[in-house]
C-alpha cells in the first residue's frame, strides 16, 4: 500500500515544534508493511491543504493527516478534508459525551461553540476515540483512497495509533519484518563493496547498511504474512551474507557480534561471560573507566564484574597495579608492555578470569611520539597475555575512547568464542 503523511500546522513550518509524528508514523506503517512514499508539512491554510489533498489523492492509497483537530479557527483539518471530499461534518456521540464530562468537571472553563469542533467527524468516518485528549480522529474512504485524521500532540496521537489504528490496518495482509545484524571490525564502505552484487539485485528481502561510531549494522527487511515466512527469507539472506569474506580474506561471520537495534558489544560480552561463568576486570588509562562503565550499564553485571582500576598517570599504574616504574619508563606508558602489564596485574589483583588493559593517546595532541588515536590494548587470560595496537585516526577524542572500548570488548568476545 502506498501511503503518505501530511503534517498540518504552521508551527512546524516556523520551527517552533519538531515533527516527531512523522518518524513515529513511518516506523509503525513500515512494521505493517505499508510504504510511506511522501512526507509533507503544510501550514494552517485551507487553500494550500486542499491543493495538497488533491495531489495526495492521485498518488497515494492511504493519506494520513495529523494535527489541526483542535477547537480554534486555525484548526481546519477535518473541515478542509470534508470540503475536499464533498462531505458534511457530523458529531461523534462518544466524543461529544467526553466533552460534556470534561466541562462538567471544570466549571471554571467556559464551553464555547468552537469546542464542539473537537467532536466532529467527516461524514462516513470510522471514529478513532482520543483516550488522552478531546479531539476525535477518524478514517474515511473515498474513491479508493483512505484518509486518516489524527490529533497533533504525540501524547494523543501515539496511543490512538497503537491501540486503534494498528489493529485496523493489520488486516491488510503482509507486514514488514526486520532483522538487524551488527558488525565490528569492518567499515561501511568495505561492507557495501562486499555486498554490492546482493544489494544491486535485491528485491525482497532488502538490505540497508547503517554506519555507527566504530561499527556497522545491516537491516534485513522482508514483507511476509507471518513470522515463520519472514524468518525463512531472512535466514536465507543472512546465510548468503555471512558466507562472504572481507577484502583482506577475513570471514564476515567472525565480524558479526550480535543482533538487534538495542544490542551492543558490551551487552554481548556480558552475556557470554555469564553463560560461561567467567569474570572480568580492567585497568584503564585513556578510557578512564569507560570500559567498566559500559559493562556495568546492564543488569547482572555484578555476576561477572567485581571492580577495576582507572590508572591515568604513570604513578597510578605503578602504585595501584604494582607495575615497576622503571619498566614503565623503559617501555613507555604507550606500549604493548604497559597494556599487557595493566591487564595481567588487574587480573591477578582481583582474581578474575579475564583482564583488560587500555592505554593510548585519546588526543588531540600526540604523546610519547605517538599520534592521537594510537591505542594499545592488552588481554590477560588463563592461557596467557597478549596485546594489539590499533590506530583510530581522524576521530574526536570522545570517539577514540569509545572505539577503544569496542576493540577491548571484541578481544574478550573472540577469546570467549575462541575465534
UniProtKB/Swiss-Prot annotation:
SUPFAM superfamilies: CinA-like, Molybdenum cofactor biosynthesis proteins. SMART domains: MoCF_biosynth (SM00852). Gene3D superfamilies: 3.30.70.2860, CinA-like, MoaB/Mog-like domain. Belongs to the CinA family. PANTHER family: NICOTINAMIDE-NUCLEOTIDE AMIDOHYDROLASE PNCC (PTHR13939), NMN AMIDOHYDROLASE-LIKE PROTEIN YFAY (PTHR13939:SF0). This is Putative competence-damage inducible protein.
Amino acid at each position: 500500500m502506498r501511503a503518505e503523511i501530511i503534517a498540518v500546522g504552521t508551527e512546524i513550518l516556523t520551527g517552533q515544534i519538531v515533527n516527531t509524528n512523522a518518524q513515529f508514523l513511518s516506523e509503525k506503517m513500515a512494521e505493517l508493511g505499508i510504504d510511506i512514499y511522501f512526507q509533507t508539512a503544510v501550514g494552517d491554510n485551507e487553500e494550500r491543504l486542499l491543493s495538497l489533498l488533491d495531489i495526495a489523492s492521485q498518488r497515494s492509497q492511504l493519506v494520513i493527516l495529523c494535527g489541526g483537530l483542535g477547537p480554534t479557527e486555525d484548526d481546519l483539518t477535518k473541515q478542509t478534508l470534508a470540503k475536499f471530499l464533498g462531505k458534511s461534518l457530523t458529531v461523534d456521540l462518544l466524543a461529544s459525551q467526553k466533552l460534556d464530562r470534561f466541562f462538567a468537571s471544570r466549571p471554571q472553563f467556559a464551553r464555547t461553540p468552537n469546542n464542539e469542533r473537537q467532536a466532529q467527524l467527516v461524514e462516513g468516518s470510522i471514529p478513532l476515540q482520543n483516550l488522552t485528549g478531546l479531539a476525535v480522529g477518524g478514517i474515511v474512504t473515498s474513491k479508493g483512497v483512505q484518509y486518516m485524521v489524527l490529533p497533533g500532540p504525540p501524547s494523543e496521537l501515539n496511543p490512538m495509533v497503537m491501540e486503534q489504528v494498528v489493529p485496523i490496518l493489520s488486516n491488510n495482509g503482509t507486514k514488514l519484518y526486520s532483522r538487524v545484524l551488527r558488525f565490528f571490525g569492518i567499515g561501511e564502505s568495505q561492507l557495501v563493496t562486499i555486498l554490492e552484487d546482493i544489494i544491486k539485485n535485491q528485491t525482497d528481502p532488502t538490505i540497508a547498511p547503517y554506519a555507527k561510531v566504530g561499527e556497522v549494522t545491516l537491516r534485513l527487511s522482508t514483507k511476509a504474512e507471518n513470522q515463520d515466512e519472514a524468518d525463512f527469507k531472512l535466514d536465507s539472506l543472512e546465510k548468503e551474507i555471512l558466507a562472504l569474506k572481507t577484502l583482506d580474506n577475513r570471514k564476515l561471520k567472525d565480524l558479526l557480534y550480535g543482533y538487534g537495534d538495542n544490542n551492543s558489544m558490551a551487552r554481548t560480552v556480558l552475556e557470554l561471560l555469564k553463560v560461561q561463568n567467567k569474570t572480568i576486570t580492567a585497568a584503564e588509562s585513556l578510557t578512564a573507566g569507560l570500559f567498566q562503565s559500559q559493562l556495568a550499564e546492564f543488569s547482572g553485571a555484578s555476576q561477572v564484574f567485581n571492580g577495576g582500576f582507572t590508572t591515568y598517570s604513570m604513578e597510578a599504574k605503578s602504585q595501584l597495579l604494582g607495575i615497576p616504574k622503571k619498566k614503565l619508563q623503559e617501555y613507555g606508558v604507550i606500549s604493548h608492555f604497559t597494556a599487557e602489564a595493566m591487564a595481567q596485574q588487574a587480573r591477578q589483583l582481583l582474581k578474575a578470569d579475564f583482564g583488560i588493559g587500555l592505554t593510548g593517546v585519546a588526543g588531540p595532541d600526540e604523546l610519547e611520539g605517538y599520534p592521537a588515536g594510537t591505542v594499545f590494548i592488552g588481554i590477560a587470560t588463563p592461557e596467557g597475555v597478549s596485546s594489539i595496537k590499533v590506530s583510530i585516526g581522524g576521530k574526536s577524542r570522545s570517539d577514540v575512547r569509545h572505539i577503544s572500548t569496542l576493540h577491548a570488548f571484541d578481544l574478550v568476545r573472540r577469546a570467549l568464542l575462541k575465534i
